């Protein structure tokens, strides 16, 4: 027998502290919709062009398909480890647990650049004067990193309440802003953005879909709060659906308004959108005046901060859950703050590593490019996490639910398998694209993108399977218990 970590016996996360609404905005804030509107949609528009709204819709539907796995698992498992615990508990030997955890660590250690480096990139795009001050971006990185620690450290109730309040306001600004722009467009409104492209533009359109999928990353993170949600087996799945719907409401109308607002607002052809500094802000200023311009700036900045808080909540609980299981992380990562009942050790370790990594790459490539390089890894790694969990759902259904008469061919076999195939296609297309780009334009930056894609794939395949083999061979007793904790 292996002695259980002390933390599991003496202290637990604060059960009942998170309501359904707060859980919804844990996921919604991770998406960072205002930041997507202001900045991240650039990648989608660069490839999908006028069909960007359709690309967003397709990506949203694909992510909805990926949400089936956490929705189904949340009915049967209440564990802060989320996809890690779902995957680990899918089989008796827990084989998928280490694979899922390593994959997710790849996203954990790279995706935070959206907040830590993205904030500086956004502010720099607003003001050439500010961007000209050497190393000022490091100050912004320090500020947001400290914020990302303090609010989650003080308690899950405080951090989720902050995200719920600001998230509702952010949603209203985006929806109302989009509606006003659409109304002001008048006869310029068109169905063209929803027309499926033809000919040589089809490939570019689907690459735009790939970028759009990244916009919805994090919608499943409410599952990391499952141990803190009262009656979580009912409320988590409800929160997942609501968050997914709200993300679509926030981004789909906004993408339509921005695309047509740009092409009809005197800014030139849509091909110039991706190369413009903060085009979302330019469109808001054109149609909503200084008030709309300032509001989008305020809520975009807040979007980076709320994303950071949501990210810290999620990552710290994943690492806490794994440390509790004694998988990869040492016991001290699984200790909770005695008063706040938050995984403060996990928060400090993760943010410390993340900050150092972001600053190093920021010094080499600049904050904006470094952030995009790291986000490339985050996208590949999180897709791998979904793929492992999808496989886990099928195995769990076969091994457990089938015997209980609860297995579903559609939800547990067809849907997750389809989602996994889509994930494989996305990773393949990303690799093929980066190879093509580098060989047509062999710059050091394009080389960095190609290297990070290859590294990300190897991280999952070699790192993940290697760790899985290690636990199955050397520590099978730990692998078997991984992910089995259930707060309910």
Q: Where do the language-model regions lie?
A:
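Transmembrane helix-loop boundary segments of multi-pass membrane transporters
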Residues: 42-53, 121-137, 156-167, 295, ...
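Membrane-interface loop-to-helix entry segments
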Residues: 137-185, 199, 217, 240-245, ...
């Amino acid at each position: 027998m292996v002695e259980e970590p002390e933390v599991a016996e003496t202290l637990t996360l604060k059960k009942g502290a998170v309501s359904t609404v707060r859980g919804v905005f844990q996921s919604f804030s991770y998406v960072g919709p205002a930041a997507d509107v202001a900045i991240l949609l650039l990648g989608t528009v660069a490839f999908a062009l006028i069909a960007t709204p359709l690309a967003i819709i397709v990506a949203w539907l694909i992510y909805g398909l990926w949400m089936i796995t956490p929705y189904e698992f949340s009915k049967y498992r209440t564990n802060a480890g989320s996809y890690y615990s779902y995957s680990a508990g899918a089989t008796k030997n827990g084989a998928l647990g280490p694979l899922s955890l390593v994959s997710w660590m790849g996203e954990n250690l790279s995706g935070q650049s959206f907040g830590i480096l993205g904030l500086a990139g956004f502010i720099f795009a607003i003001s050439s004067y500010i961007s000209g001050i050497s190393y000022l971006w490091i100050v912004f990185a320090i500020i947001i990193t400290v914020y990302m620690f303090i609010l989650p450290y003080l308690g899950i109730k405080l951090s989720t309440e902050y995200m719920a309040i600001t998230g509702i306001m952010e949603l209203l600004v985006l929806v109302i802003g989009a509606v006003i722009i659409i109304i002001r467009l008048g006869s310029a409104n068109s169905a063209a953005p929803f027309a499926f492209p033809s000919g040589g533009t089809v490939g570019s359109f689907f690459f735009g879909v790939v970028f759009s999928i990244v916009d919805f990353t994090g919608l499943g993170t409410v599952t990391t709060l499952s141990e803190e949600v009262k009656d979580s087996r009912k409320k988590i799945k409800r929160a997942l659906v609501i968050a997914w719907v709200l993300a679509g409401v926030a981004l789909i109308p906004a993408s339509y308004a921005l695309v047509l607002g740009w092409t009809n607002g005197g800014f030139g052809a849509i091909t110039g959108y991706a190369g413009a500094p903060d085009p979302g802000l330019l469109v808001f200023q054109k149609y909503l005046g200084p008030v709309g311009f300032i509001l989008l700036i305020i809520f975009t900045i807040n979007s980076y901060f709320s994303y950071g808080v949501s990210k810290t909540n999620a990552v710290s609980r994943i690492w806490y859950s794994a440390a509790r299981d004694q998988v990869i992380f040492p016991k001290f990562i699984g200790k909770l703050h005695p008063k706040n009942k938050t995984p403060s050790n996990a928060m400090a370790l993760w943010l410390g590593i993340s900050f150092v990594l972001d600053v190093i790459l920021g010094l080499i490539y600049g904050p904006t490019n470094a952030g995009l390089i790291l986000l490339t890894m985050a996208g590949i790694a999180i897709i791998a996490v979904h793929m492992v969990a999808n496989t886990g759902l099928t195995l769990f259904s076969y091994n457990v639910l089938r015997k209980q008469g609860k297995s579903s061919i559609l939800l547990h076999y067809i849907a997750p398998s389809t989602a996994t195939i889509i994930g494989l296609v996305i990773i393949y297309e990303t690799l093929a694209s980066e190879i093509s780009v580098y060989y047509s334009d062999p710059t050091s930056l394009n080389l960095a993108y190609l290297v990070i894609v290859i590294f990300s794939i190897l991280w999952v395949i070699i790192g993940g399977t290697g760790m899985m083999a290690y636990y199955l061979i050397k520590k099978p007793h730990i692998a078997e218990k991984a992910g089995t904790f259930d707060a309910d």
